[in-house]
Amino acid sequence: MLVLGIESSCDETGLALYDTQRGLLAHALHSQIAMHREYGGVVPELASRDHIRRALPLLDEVMIQSGTHRDDIDAIAFTQGPGLAGALLVGASIANALALAWNKPTIGIHHLEGHLLSPLLVDAPPPFPFIALLVSGGHTQLMRVTDVGVYETLGETLDDAAGEAFDKTAKLIGLGYPGGPEVSRLAETGTPGAVVLPRPMLHSGDLDFSFSGLKTAVLTQMKKFEAAKLEGDALERAKADLARGFVDAAVDVLVAKSLAALKQTKLKRLVVAGGVGANRQLRAALSAAAAKRGFDVHYPDLALCTDNGAMIALAGALRLGRWPEQANTDYAFTVKPRWDLASLAR
């Protein structure tokens, strides 16, 4: 089965072709980072308009790259939610218009299910069951994954997502957009232990997260720098130490909760997905813990940690392979800006 995947939930336009026999044939991505940078964040209306401009050229790119003709495609998968309503509508409209013109079925995919399954795109994919740590700008969750469509939420953030905390911390420190990668880069130049920040809910006894207090601690520390009248090199060193303190705290919590989930479920495989899954400090800490405690940790390729069409095409192919009745052939569709992943559980 050959599936075309279309991702447009936020500020990346992604298209890809995935074949159940041959794997990922092609994927193309356009990021809107440069466009949104001057505003310090994603502007939903601009995001929607840019998806309209980019989708069809990216479609041409993946078709040419893979040598695929439209007659070869068996189905079209698109991100149905969660995400920005306007951006989702663009992708859904394009997917259903193409499907109508080409006489193909469609299937709407949960964005987080795409992330959750994206490590299956690697050459040696992890077998089920496993624990999934989903960490992105909008979501932080620990899931028990028994099979495609069989998900149990073990823990989730009670306020800010991890990626959101990274972005807000970057803004408080005065870094550019997107903030997550910027604060991570700055942290690598900071001194470990120079600034120690709280580890929210580290000993809560459950698998939930909270990052709002960590963000507040960063703000408090910046006010201390201001009161001390730090400037020049001294201020830059202090900011680097603060970034290091923030990243160390966030990583400690993510790792500790992941280890607790593995212990609670007695599973030996951890999958990490979502944009924060590309963070080098998080990967290093999890790899060290895996070596010490004897479990396997799996990630998607770095290029597929961000939003992308490949994960949507994969999820569509896996769902249609198991439940062909989920194919839509009347081309009526809705989008779901808010959509609980656990609601997909079968």
From Swiss-Prot:
Question: Where is the protein situated, by its record's location annotation?
Answer: Cytoplasm
Q: What NCBIfam families does its record include?
A: gcp_kae1, T6A_TsaD_YgjD
- What PANTHER family does the entry give? TRNA N6-ADENOSINE THREONYLCARBAMOYLTRANSFERASE, TRNA N6-ADENOSINE THREONYLCARBAMOYLTRANSFERASE, MITOCHONDRIAL
Q: What is the lineage of its organism?
A: Bacteria, Pseudomonadati, Pseudomonadota, Betaproteobacteria, Burkholderiales
Keyword Nuclease set for record: no
Positions of Fe cation binding: 111, 115, 307
Q: Which residues bind substrate?
A: 134-138, 167, 180, 279
One Gene Ontology MF term: iron ion binding
Q: Which coenzymes or cofactors are required?
A: Fe(2+)
Similarity section: Belongs to the KAE1 / TsaD family.
Q: Which UniProt keywords apply?
A: Acyltransferase, Cytoplasm, Iron, Metal-binding, Transferase, tRNA processing
Q: Name one GO cellular component term.
A: cytoplasm
Reactions catalysed, semicolon-separated, are:
L-threonylcarbamoyladenylate + adenosine(37) in tRNA = N(6)-L-threonylcarbamoyladenosine(37) in tRNA + AMP + H(+)
What biological-process terms (Gene Ontology) are attached? tRNA threonylcarbamoyladenosine modification
Natural source organism: Burkholderia vietnamiensis (strain G4 / LMG 22486) (Burkholderia cepacia (strain R1808))
Its annotated function is as follows: Required for the formation of a threonylcarbamoyl group on adenosine at position 37 (t(6)A37) in tRNAs that read codons beginning with adenine. Is involved in the transfer of the threonylcarbamoyl moiety of threonylcarbamoyl-AMP (TC-AMP) to the N6 group of A37, together with TsaE and TsaB. TsaD likely plays a direct catalytic role in this reaction.
> What protein name applies here?
tRNA N6-adenosine threonylcarbamoyltransferase
Q: What is its EC number?
A: 2.3.1.234
Matching SUPFAM superfamilies:
Actin-like ATPase domain
Give me the comment on cofactor binding.
Binds 1 Fe(2+) ion per subunit.
The primary location reported for this protein is cytoplasm
Query: What HAMAP family does the entry give?
Result: TsaD
